[in-house]
Curated annotation (Swiss-Prot):
GO CC terms in record: chloride channel complex; filopodium membrane; filopodium tip; membrane; plasma membrane; smooth endoplasmic reticulum membrane; synapse
Ranges of the Cytoplasmic topological domain: 65-88, 236-240, 412-450
Localization per record: Cell membrane
Ranges per topology, Extracellular: 1-43, 110-214, 262-390
Tissue and organ distribution: Expressed in brain, eye, ovary and testis, and at lower levels in muscle, placenta, liver and lung.
Native source organism of the sequence: Homo sapiens (Human)
Carbohydrate attachment residues: N130, N205, N284, N355
Biological process annotations from GO: cell morphogenesis; cell-cell adhesion; cell-substrate adhesion; chloride transport; filopodium assembly; gene expression; iron ion transport; L-glutamate transmembrane transport
Name of the featured protein: Protein tweety homolog 1
Reaction(s) catalysed (UniProt annotation): chloride(in) = chloride(out); L-glutamate(out) = L-glutamate(in)
Keyword Cell membrane in record: yes
Predominant location: membrane
């Protein structure tokens, strides 16, 4: 299969494509993109399930660590205000983990933007291909209608005017037959007319899904950013209630991070299988959805010398018919106009129609060449297999950093808030001190009672 211009499978595609795949029975599955097959679906689900396994192991590790911390902690002597050894190390490890999580959030924003750019490039390529196909249909329809109108009006009028001269009538009828033949050949060039699959509809569906995917990731990134910032604030202010609330939120974001990691990993693996050799799948799917012949689809997907233009014969016959019409009209203009001046008007109208038809024909020749649609195909692959896949890998790195940072924070936060001084420590001030909170409270109560 020939590669589209400017597209070559990247190193990431080759690396992910080489990873082994297995179904639920752990039997090997070929790395061929086949989403309709059950074994391949199971292989991708198994990749996503690895993230679920990681989540389970993380939760077990956190639970065991916290149980050990709660049950095996040596009792502190009553009234002791000496911080336990290693307390500062625990707090700083939590801070470093949260800062690493913030770094992962930055990577996540970049990956989300890259993925969105790749999908936007895919949508733009589909829209340009839809414009090309619509232009072909419009030009064919306009040209056929012009030729049909010329046959019904100008050529009929010309035959009536030239009726006294049999040989001139025969020439006009020859031009009629050539116009009808050209219209018939041109009508077969609108190969996408009536096809149920619309690139415009596909582009709209892709953009619709991408908008919600982008928004979901932005909300996830902002949620984790808020959790990290408020946790750091709680540690700085030594606010126990804020740290406890953020611990619960960290657990929620940890679950979301592992879930997004599984989705990203399965998508990246499946996308690498598609991008390693996209032509067979695109060819089969498009043929199934459109019903077009494999010759037409192969011509536009491959666009090389090994595949001939399936419209070449129709184009040649149409060009020959238009040339014959042109020569016959020139002959009629030389011989008929001096004898039948009233024939000049329909002849001029026919020449104008022929000039417009030839202009449309040359546009059709350029549009029907494989270069334009094949270029759109290559742009779509570059957007999907380069930018979008790279963005997915950055999102995968974000999820990994996020899961590690939050797991570390969940282990450190309970130990950190256990080191916070109790609220009673703030009451160990002189009772006669006017700035003592308790004394101020009693003073306000005394004033209200007066």
């Amino acid at each position: 299969m020939g590669a589209p211009p400017g597209y070559r499978p990247s190193a990431w595609v080759h690396l992910l494509h080489q990873l082994p795949r297995a179904d639920f029975q752990l039997r090997p599955v070929p790395s061929v993109f086949a989403p309709q097959e059950q074994e391949y679906q199971q292989a991708l689900l198994l990749v996503a399930a690895l993230a679920g396994l990681g989540l389970g192991l993380s939760l077990i590790f956190i639970a065991v660590y916290l149980i050990r911390f709660c049950c095996c902690r040596p009792p502190e002597p009553p009234g002791s205000k000496i911080p336990s050894p290693g307390g500062g190390c625990v707090t700083w490890s939590c801070i470093v983990a949260l800062l690493a999580g913030c770094t992962g959030i930055g990577i996540g924003f970049y990956g989300n933007s890259e993925t969105s750019d790749g999908v936007s490039q895919l949508s733009s390529a589909l829209l340009h291909a839809n414009h090309t196909l619509s232009t072909i249909d419009h030009l064919v329809l306009e040209t056929v209608e012009r030729l049909g109108e010329a046959v019904r009006t100008e050529l009929t009028t010309l035959e009536e005017v030239l009726e006294p001269r049999t040989e001139l009538v025969a020439a006009a009828r020859g031009a009629r037959r050539q116009a009808e033949a050209a219209a018939q050949q041109l009508q077969g060039l609108a190969f996408w007319q009536g096809v149920p699959l619309s690139p415009l509809q596909v582009a709209e569906n892709v953009s619709f899904v991408e908008e919600y995917r982008w928004l979901a990731y932005v909300l996830l990134l902002l949620l984790e950013l808020l959790v990290c910032l408020f946790t750091l604030l709680g540690l700085a202010k030594q606010s126990k209630w804020l740290v406890i609330v953020m611990t619960v939120m960290s657990l929620l974001v940890l679950v979301l991070s592992w879930g997004s990691m599984g989705l990203e990993a399965a998508t990246a693996v499946g996308l690498s299988d598609f991008c390693s050799n996209p032509d067979p799948y695109v060819l089969n799917l498009t043929q199934e959805e459109t019903g077009l012949s494999s010759d037409i689809l192969s011509y536009y997907l491959l666009c090389n010398r090994a595949v001939s233009n399936p419209f070449q014969q129709r184009l040649t016959l149409s060009q020959r018919a238009l040339a014959n019409i042109h020569s016959q009209l020139l002959g009629l203009e030389r011989e008929a106009v001096p004898q039948f001046p009233s024939a000049q008007k329909p002849l001029l109208s026919l020449e104008e129609t022929l000039n417009v038809t030839e202009g449309n024909f040359h546009q059709l020749v350029a549009l029907l060449h494989c270069r334009s649609l094949h270029k759109d195909y290559g742009a779509a692959l570059r957007g999907l297999c380069e930018d979008a896949l790279e963005g997915l890998l950055f999102l995968l790195l974000f999820s990994l950093l996020s899961a590690g940072a939050l797991a570390t924070a969940l282990c450190s936060l309970p130990r950190a808030w256990a080191l916070f001084p109790p609220s009673d420590d703030y009451d160990d001030t002189d009772d006669d001190d006017p700035f003592n909170p308790q004394e101020s409270k009693r003073f306000v109560q005394w004033q209200s009672s007066i």
